[in-house]
Swiss-Prot record:
The gene is MT-CYB. Component of the ubiquinol-cytochrome c reductase complex (complex III or cytochrome b-c1 complex) that is part of the mitochondrial respiratory chain. The b-c1 complex mediates electron transfer from ubiquinol to cytochrome c. Contributes to the generation of a proton gradient across the mitochondrial membrane that is then used for ATP synthesis. It comes from Malayopython reticulatus. One of its GO terms (molecular function) is ubiquinol-cytochrome-c reductase activity. This is Cytochrome b. It comes from the Eukaryota. One of its GO terms (cellular component) is mitochondrial inner membrane. Heme b b562 binds at H75, H174. It is a multi-pass membrane protein.
Amino acid sequence: MPHHYILTLFGLLPVATNISTWWNFGSMLLTCLALQVLTGFFLAVHYTANINLAFSSIIHITRDVPYGWMMQNLHAIGASMFFICIYIHIARGLYYGSYLNKETWMSGITLLITLMATAFFGYVLPWGQMSFWAATVITNLLTAVPYLGTSLTTWLWGGFAINDPTLTRFFALHFILPFAIISLSSLHVILLHEEGSSNPLGTNPDIDKIPFHPYHSYKDFLLLTLMVLSLFIIVSFFPDIFNDPDNFSKANPLVTPQHIKPEWYFLFAYGILRSIPNQLGGALALVMSIMILFTIPFTHTANLRPMTFRPLYQLMFWTLVSTFITITWAATKPVEPPFITISQVTSTLYFTFFISIPFLGWMENKMMHLN
């Protein structure tokens, strides 16, 4: 075994010749993770987890710390880039049937949940107006849990309201969870390379494989360069594009913002939550909007793996994509007609996609046998 065996392992990794650009997002996610850990460390050095000083410490980072503004913007916009990549990565897995590699899919969805928790805790840390109220609304959902709800909420807050202990523990969780993400990512990659990645045709590629390096590594590097370039263009010219104007004001528990909403990457789940007028029902729908992804490997009934040759399933998939975008857009709007109706219709369509998977598979199998 050579002394640089890990590099050799990745270099000689056998990969299907026909994987497309959609398979590049794994390496892009790894880059995002490295960037987030690095910038997060430099921010944590200057951040103060105290409700009286947190907002001021962010101002201090952006104004007084050398290149602090860049670190802060890279970390905030890097999170958005992370979610763009992970949503495309999941969509590719859905489209090309990668979920049939069950262990890899399960570890990937666990990764998504951990990432969402990390991002939520991070959004609270600047202690701006929207940070505070988003944290209040989302953590309040725990009160919907029968019998234990109030105790759970008090335990999470560290008191009877969101206060100093809440911010301290959220900072601790935001610091520790990325290490869980790194561990899960390693497990995800190990499980993936145990069976090998899928390909656009959904066939067994064992007879036609090439080394990962140099063929696919250069292909990955192209999209990676475009992503980093986009990131730096946004950081330099449009740093506040994903920010909420309310978050430029310090948290004030006495003043409620006109429209409370989380970061854009949670809006689809928040839109589903808001579309149900019952608190427990909304909380369950919110949890199920992510958890339902775990069921997909078990509901696949089609003879073909990818959607490449499945027109019915393709139609449903692109309906899901447009539904996802519409829920996200509707969740940015106030809770009033017609946005309530739009949210309810799109939420129903979102869950319909996952429920219809086995029936579509059976229907397509039947049509193929008829032909």
